[in-house]
Design a protein with these regions (language model features):
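Ligand-binding pockets and gating/stacking loops
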Residues: 1-327
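Conserved small/polar residues in nucleotide/adenosyl-binding loops
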Residues: 328-334
């Protein structure tokens, strides 16, 4: 999971969402530029989407799909005027505290987070309120069904956030099943891949289909890149009877909208589905292609740290031009749902 997000399998490198917001900034100053939507906490926890050595203002706001944002509502005894006065006093104190500590980036980011939280009190609840959608829309996403409710809500939230200028939204579904119930069953089919994948696939199939249709009907799909995938595939040989083991040597991801050529496919595995043998794509290639579609040259998006320039694709990565509608030079999509 770390490698799919940051290009490296070790902690400490920035996640792709942080790189994108570092490169493109945010379109809505009242909402975060990078949002993570999850049910159960994915294996690896928060480090998999951390900003690494990038300034902490590029870290995501992580939101539980069943309990969106905690501690966002101010106390009933405090009105907007009094809260603004309180924050102004806090800002003045922080300024005095921060002047001799101007090189402490984490401190500056922490101070900035208070202001963002204040602005989010108005913008975030409205953006996250799935109940503002029509009954027909909620049913299309599967919000009314137990199996699809969690991912359906996440997909609606993602569309609403993108609609309001959030630059990068990342959804996690079927991560570990730790208390998530049927709606968050993991894709880890070691014992019975048939039963496991039927449930896991059902939880995402209707919601993601509805998201694509919804984005297209609203004229948003051409400006929004949607990326769907995991971190590895499964072996073709049996494990524990009906199960399948992990297989990082060959697996599938798909992309839609945002300059992707519909119906195109790239790469192939051997006859056993065990190993990629034709037009192999690395994680660096995937990241280079995503950044290209968002208008970013992956070789020029760099950050100086520990004596050298770092980038998401490190020293590798090539754009997969064969899956693009055209070789973009301008008028690029600027939002991403992963």
């Amino acid at each position: 999971m770390l490698e799919m997000n940051s290009g490296m399998f070790l902690q400490g490198r920035p996640a792709m969402g942080s790189w994108v917001t570092y490169g493109l900034g945010s379109e809505n100053q009242n909402l975060p530029g990078f949002v993570v939507l999850h049910g159960s906490m994915p294996r690896g926890g928060k480090p998999i989407w951390a900003p690494g050595f990038l300034p902490k203002k590029f870290q995501p706001t992580a939101i539980n799909g069943t309990n969106p944002i905690g501690n966002l509502t101010r106390r009933k005894s405090m009105d907007d005027q009094h809260q603004r006065a309180q924050l102004d006093i806090l800002r003045a104190m922080n300024r005095v505290h921060g002047e001799p500590r101007s090189l402490e980036r984490d401190l500056a980011a922490r101070i900035e987070s208070f202001e963002l939280a204040y602005r989010m009190q108005t913008a975030a609840p409205e953006a996250m309120d799935v109940n503002q959608e029509s009954k027909a829309t909620q049913q299309a996403y599967g919000v009314d069904q137990k199996e699809t409710q969690l991912v359906g809500r996440q997909c609606i939230m993602a569309r609403r956030l993108i609609e309001r200028g959030v630059r990068f939204v990342q959804l996690y579904a079927g991560t570990n099943g730790g208390g998530g119930g049927v709606a968050d069953v993991p894709w880890d089919g070691h014992n019975d891949i048939g039963a496991n994948h039927r449930i896991a696939a059902k939880s995402v199939d209707q919601p993601i289909g509805a998201l694509l249709s919804d984005l297209k009907s609203r004229g948003m799909l051409e400006d929004t890149l949607v990326v769907w995938g995991g971190e590895f595939g499964r072996t073709s040989d049996a494990q524990s009877g009906k199960g399948r083991d992990h297989n990082p040597n060959a697996f599938t991801m798909w992309m839609a909208g945002g300059g992707i050529k519909g119906g195109a496919h790239y790469g192939a595995s051997d006859e056993f589905g065990y190993k990629a043998v034709e037009n192999r794509v690395s994680v660096n290639d995937l990241h280079a292609t995503i950044l290209h579609l968002l208008g970013i040259d992956h070789e020029r998006l760099t950050y100086f740290f520990n004596g050298r320039d770092f980038r998401l694709t490190d020293v590798a990565g090539k754009v997969i031009n064969e899956i693009l509608c055209l070789l973009y030079t301008s008028d690029l999509p600027t939002n991403c749902v992963v």
